[in-house]
């Protein structure tokens, strides 16, 4: 290092530089606790958030509540459902149902579809004829059974998996 660079480094640090080649020094283990680490961890998402400003916390979109009640930030409590139920008396039944749907969406899950016996019978009959129904058949079934088309598609996927599993088990029993 040239004398000018060494002098500049001393001015930046504000203290004379001491060169130590010990493992502790190289790894930075000999630094005092109050010293700031020389390298920052690589967190590209932090740079994006910090450029948005100090109030750039990402929040779950929840419908507005009556009487100026605000929903708590998801990070405030590990279980948002429990926190939301504290405010249960303030909401009508439809608002509570909407809130529960929002919380299910937050967890990435939709409520499980409970098929009636009649719906299952119709779906099983169609499955016996065609285990890979096209979109037109699924939409027709959805209309007749009062279900969403994607629920019917998932039902057929699950039914094919069940059939495959039963074939595998029967092959295992024969061997």
From Swiss-Prot:
GO terms for biological process: pituitary gland development. CDD domains: homeodomain. Transmembrane segments: none annotated. Residues 1-44 are annotated as: Disordered. GO terms for cellular component: nucleus. The keyword Repeat does not apply. Keywords: Developmental protein, DNA-binding, Homeobox, Nucleus, Transcription, Transcription regulation. GO terms for molecular function: DNA binding; DNA-binding transcription repressor activity, RNA polymerase II-specific; RNA polymerase II cis-regulatory region sequence-specific DNA binding. InterPro entries: HD (IPR001356), Hesx1 (IPR043402), Homeobox_CS (IPR017970), Homeodomain-like_sf (IPR009057). It is found in: Nucleus. Residues 108-167 bind DNA. Its main location: nucleus. PANTHER family: HOMEOBOX EXPRESSED IN ES CELLS 1. Required for the normal development of the forebrain, eyes and other anterior structures such as the olfactory placodes and pituitary gland. Possible transcriptional repressor. Binds to the palindromic PIII sequence, 5'-AGCTTGAGTCTAATTGAATTAACTGTAC-3'. Interacts with TLE1. Belongs to the ANF homeobox family. This is Homeobox expressed in ES cells 1.
